[in-house]
Swiss-Prot record:
Induction: By stress conditions e.g. heat shock. Keywords: ATP-binding, Chaperone, Nucleotide-binding, Phosphoprotein, Stress response. Residues 601-612 have a biased composition (Low complexity). It comes from Borrelia garinii subsp. bavariensis (strain ATCC BAA-2496 / DSM 23469 / PBi). The gene is dnaK. This is Chaperone protein DnaK. The keyword Electron transport does not apply.
Length: 635
């Protein structure tokens, strides 16, 4: 069995790790970073950029640079109204009602899983470069509070990236694995995970290699992006007061504000104030305008207090659902970059009555845990068992629009539950089964995961037919539902594919697109390498030509100069084969210089040897004399 990599597919950053010799290792990307920005961009030439290179051009290309796409994964268009306001790129309604991104530079509408797949491909390639072998399998993490549609979308993203997703693991659970891999004693741990776009809290019991999740809760609309947004709104307001100019509709200015807000937020975790300086942020009739502002930690904490407080209720619910008191918890682990905010650390202490444990790297713990889970699946990591839970209750709509729950939230997975229902009307020959996820009493107030029809039921008075509905949740938290008429034995099964999910044909098309992109990326890399080789040869040849111009014939010199000129002209074209052939021609032409350099070097060596009283070995006579002396010694 090959290596299974562990990927933390984050809202802001992603990270990849692998098990080596029983230890998890975080893999550096090609730029030397241990985490990679979860950013994908398309240039005006249609070139795709992923990671740091995409982040570097955000300000100048805001509408075609996609960040925080995780907020739109598996979501219907009407569910993301608040998220749309937070991003400069265009979100549209897809044909099946899901949220999609319109990318003007490639004139294409793309789904969130397709965009996330680009980041996963970068993670896959990072691991392949490190391991020196092809990678096809992965464990990918998701927020614990992700619903079925969001989990399925994540799995689809993996498939598009050419990865078989062996397991979907909840982020707090993965972090607990990273924390507890070498712990032997029993303890109860809370994982407080505040990332770029989501918040999760999970309570786990650890002991003897068993990691059992007791409860989980969270908010998939709360994360570091929201904290950045508060700073942005404040800066826009202050600038408007000062200059009477509203920056809220200037996409390029908003992108600069986004970068500055994120930087200030990070600075305020270690300093009492942060200076924000954005020269030439805009202009009016009087000339350019500059934004200068000093944000204090006290002001920042005042601005984001409502967000900090929003994390309290999920924590209290999780403690209650686990059947515990805050004092029963032995350790509180912080995960996610936003947990570095002092106000967050303070509320964690207030909720749990203890200082949080800072022994786990909040940026890498989730990927490390995913790698450990990969090791468990391959058998490389032994004596460890992970028992996770479903975050939300599952059920069906019954008479009167009520949600009847079959599986309660925080049930250990995998699990299966069945219940017998009947018809609501006389002579009813089919039933429409609506599958729901959520905690509300009425069906309409919960999320419809999907629906299917069981027909062919024999006509009978209402209440007579016996229809068994079975829910099956696999280890990834993905739901499978079946309905069976007990009288006829007729059965209907479905794996829930949300109404906002991708169809198999769409996924297949996206896989082909991703493969085409991989080919494009390969060609682009070849092109860059060919140009780099050519430029290097031109530089070396021109330098050598200058140095040895008096020692080579005018004909050779002219021939070399012509080849340099031809190669320079080919660099303006995108023809790799032409660049390579002309590079080879210049290489051959420049051999004349190499001969002169070698001859010059040989003469210099001979001169040095004579000065040291050593006879030169370059002449034929010298070689013979040396041979004869050696021969005499042998006699």
């Amino acid at each position: 069995m090959g290596k299974i990599i562990g990927i933390d597919l984050g809202t802001t950053n992603s990270c990849v790790a692998i098990m080596e010799h029983g230890k998890p290792v975080v893999i550096q990307n090609s730029e030397g970073g241990r985490t990679t920005p979860s950013i994908v961009a398309y240039t005006n030439k249609g070139e795709r950029l992923v990671g740091q290179v995409a982040k570097n051009q955000m300000v100048t290309n805001p509408e075609n640079t996609i960040y925080s796409i995780k907020r739109f994964m598996g979501r219907r268009f009407e569910e993301v109204a608040s998220e749309i306001k937070m991003v400069p790129y265009k979100i549209e309604k897809g044909l099946n009602g899901d949220a999609r991104v319109n990318i003007s530079n490639i004139k294409k509408q793309m789904s969130p899983p397709e965009i996330s797949a680009a980041t996963l491909t970068k993670m896959k390639e990072t691991a392949e470069a490190y391991l020196g072998e092809k990678v096809t399998e992965a464990v990918i993490t998701v927020p614990a509070y992700f619903n079925d549609a969001q989990r399925q979308a994540t799995k689809d993203a993996g498939k598009i990236a050419g990865l078989e997703v062996k397991r979907i693991v909840n982020e707090p659970t993965a972090a607990a694995l990273a924390y507890g891999i070498e712990k032997k004693h029993e303890e109860i741990v809370a994982v407080y995970d505040l990332g770029g776009g989501t918040f999760d809290i999970s309570i786990l019991e650890l002991g003897d290699g068993v990691f059992e999740v007791k409860s989980t809760n969270g908010d998939t609309h709360l994360g570091g992006d929201n904290f950045d947004d508060e700073i942005i709104k404040h800066l826009i307001s202050e600038f408007k007061k000062e200059s009477a100019i509203d920056l809220s509709n200037d996409k390029m200015a908003l992108q600069r504000l986004k970068e500055a807000a994120e930087k200030a937020k990070i600075e305020l975790s270690g300093a009492q104030e942060a200076s924000i300086n954005l020269p030439f942020i805009t202009a009016d009739a009087n000339g350019p305008k500059h934004l200068q502002y000093t944000l204090t930690r006290a002001k920042f904490e005042q601005m984001v207090d409502h967000l900090v407080q929003k994390t309290k209720e999920p924590c209290l619910k999780a403690i209650k659902d686990a059947g515990l008191k805050a004092s029963d918890i032995n350790e509180v682990i912080l995960v996610g970059g936003s947990t570095r905010i002092p106000a967050i650390q303070k509320i964690v202490k207030d909720i749990f009555g203890q200082d949080p444990n800072k022994g786990v790297n909040p940026d890498e713990a989730v990927a490390i845990g995913a790698a450990i889970q990969g090791g468990i699946l391959t058998g490389e990591t032994k004596d460890m068992v992970l028992l996770d839970v479903t975050p939300l209750s599952l059920g069906i709509e019954t008479l009167g629009g009520v949600m009847t729950k079959l599986i309660e939230r925080n049930t250990t997975i995998p699990t299966k539950k069945s219940q017998v229902f009947s018809t609501a009307a006389d002579n009813q020959t089919s039933v429409d089964i609506k599958v729901l996820q959520g905690e509300r009493e009425m069906a309409a107030q919960n999320r419809i995961l999907g629906n299917f029809i069981l027909d062919g039921i024999p006509a009978a008075p209402r209440g007579v037919p016996q229809i068994e509905v079975s829910f099956d949740i696999d280890a990834n938290g993905i739901v499978h539902v079946s309905a069976k008429d007990m009288g006829t034995g007729k059965e209907q099964k479905i794996r829930i594919e949300s109404s906002s999910g991708l169809s198999e044909s769409e996924i297949d098309r996206m896989v082909k697109d991703a493969e085409a992109h991989a080919e494009e990326d390969k060609k682009l890399k070849e092109n860059i390498e060919a140009k780099n080789t050519a430029n290097s040869l031109i530089y070396q040849t021109e330098k050598s030509l200058k140095e040895y111009s008096e020692k080579i014939s005018s004909e050779d010199k002219e021939a070399i100069e012509n080849k340099i000129k031809e190669l320079k002209e080919s660099l303006d074209k995108e023809d790799i084969s032409l660049i390579k052939s002309r590079t080879e021609e210049l290489q051959k032409a420049s051999y004349k210089i190499a001969e002169m350099m070698y001859k010059d070097s040989s003469q210099q060596n001979a001169s040095n040897q004579q000065e040291n009283g050593t006879q030169s070995n370059t002449s034929e006579e010298g070689k013979e004399a040396d041979y004869e002396v050696v021969d005499e010694d042998k006699k």
